[in-house]
Amino acid sequence: KTPSAEYPADYTGGFILINTKEIPVSNSLSFTVGGNWNDASLGDFSTFSKSTSSLESMGSSLLTGGFNNDWMVKNKNVYGDLKLGMNGAYRWQLGAHRLGLIAAANYSNEYRTYEDMQNNLFGVYDVANDHSNYLRHSVDDQYNNNRRIGAMLNFTLLSPSGNHKYELKNIFNHLTNQRYTWREGVSAQANLENSAEYYYRSRTAYNGQLTGKHTFTGDQLDWSVGYAYANRHLPDRRRYLVDDAIENGQMALTTGNDISREWTQLDEHIFSANVNNKKELKFNAWTPSLKFGAYGEYRTREYKAREFIYNWDASNNSLPAGFRQMDIPTLLSDEANLGAGKLDVLEQVRWRNNYSGHNTLGAGYLTASLPFGPLSILAGVRFEHNDMELISNTRDNERSESSRHYRDDDLFPSFNATYKFNDQHQLRASYGRTINRPEFREVSSSVYYDFDLASSVQGNTELKSCRIDNIDLRYEFYPSRGEQISVAAFYKHFDSPIEWTYTVAGGTDLIYSYKNAQSANNIGLELDIRKDLSFIGLRNFSWSFNGALIHSRVTFPAGFKEENRPMQGQSPYLVNTGLFYRNEGQKLNVALLYNRIGKRIIGVGRSEGTTGSGSDETARIPDSYEMPRNVFDLSASKRFGDHWELKVNLRDILAEKVYYKQFAEVRYADGSHKKVDEIVRRYKPGRNIGFSLVYKL
């Protein structure tokens, strides 16, 4: 949580260092098989025949020779989730060298059903008629099948002296999400609407790193070179919509735009190199140290999107009579209805939805560790040069590439001081500057239609980096081994924070995008406790608690039609606590966990003129909030002998509904006012009951 010059500066809340095992103490191999039951996701499950082919692999006749024309929805019974895992650790003696291997693989297949999910869009409250202004009022049934394959393979080679260590680390993950959504609702024009989305997404990520650590007299040197690859493919996302716009109560196709297919593909490559050196100094009894290093990263990204709509000649076609009123999956699955003179496909050429980019980051830093008796100071500065080039098209109808650079050159100072009163008590104070740079997708003009939001999502080419000043004052008390009580006060100032916003376009449609606010300030208190409870007679019990209170405010220039409010995504409080039981004699572990966060803005609304009710009050699309909910988890593990272990867990025991709300502030011409709760989304996630059985060789 404390900035330091040796760490990358592009973060806001904290930086996570992940260390994996190197050379194991002994050889081991274990296998895990497990299951999970979500009580909202058992029984009937709707799915479809997915497409995995790229457009490039299809022939010239897409409708009859390339597209998957099976639109029929299949139903099957779901009995739960499956999880499999394997972990291995081995060590060898190669002459005087030691070699270690850590390997792991896992597989999971899970089903999640969200039925009767309320999913609404609201505009500015209708003061004249005193009711909420629905841009869409709908109920969704959504069926998700998520699969994951993961693997890790790490090698470590240690020199005979132990002063030189080399590691090769590899992590691979492949995730897929197959989702079918059925939606029934009413549009802003008061038309009945039925729509569906057939969604299949695959994501692949690989991260490889070769590192070295070397200890010399007075110096500790470490280095790394790495390569990472990530992709996100959506092959053939299909959507259709029918409504009663033509004839009241009669659901039918209105236009060809109501049936669409879309292919998107995102590929990213990252190359990196890093070197650090720590030099121990000695001036009589004073032993300061210096640490300095450099980091370089080059990233490339390419995003491609193609969209097709179904079209027909309204006056001259050979389609069945009344085809507009037919069941759409039946209509589209019959190839007799496809082709020239029938239902044909037309590509929506939108070159502006494609982009590519390059990002070059170069950094160097210097820190000094200065001990002064009970006071120790770690001070440093980091320089980062970042150049992000976005290559996008300026016109939809043809390739028209234009390049734009987003460059930052920044110094990031950091200062950490620790005063140690004794072995149990110490006081910490820190300051550091960090940055939050926009991502490619946030500055691209590419438009993507999000079916869940029933809205388009678009980047903002004028987005700029946010710089954060962090101040932290922390008192720490260590009563005994493994115990800690700390109290902290912190302050963060954000210059131009990046936020997720939405606004009305075309009268009834919402567009989500990103924007910079002028500034924001967060000030808070944090309490962290880890305590053994044997002092009150509860042997083998321990308690942990982490809680924070945060006051957050975004500020805008004078005269702006925006309200001072909390920063998007920031909760006013959070609570994480757990009660743990650990009995080594019985080989039993039990944990009860509780989590709650305060309501937080997930989408920033905006002003839209005046209310039009005889008042000069500003009309606003309200901010959208994720509401608090109580989450209890219970887990237990029991070892049997030297080989078997049984793990059981209950997650989200209360299974409280998830709510997203807006709060419309309504003011009337006579001066009276009220607040109206508007439910943007509501669904029940279900509780999870899981077990796993581990066998160790």
Indicate where each model-derived feature is located.
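A beta-strand signature from Gram-negative outer-membrane beta-barrel systems
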Residues: 1-30
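Gram-negative outer-membrane beta-barrel transporters
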Residues: 490-493, 511-604
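C-terminal beta-signal and adjacent terminal beta-strands/loops
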Residues: 596-612, 637-697
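Surface-exposed extracellular loop regions of Gram-negative outer-membrane beta-barrel proteins
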Residues: 231-233, 324-343, 387, 423-470, ...
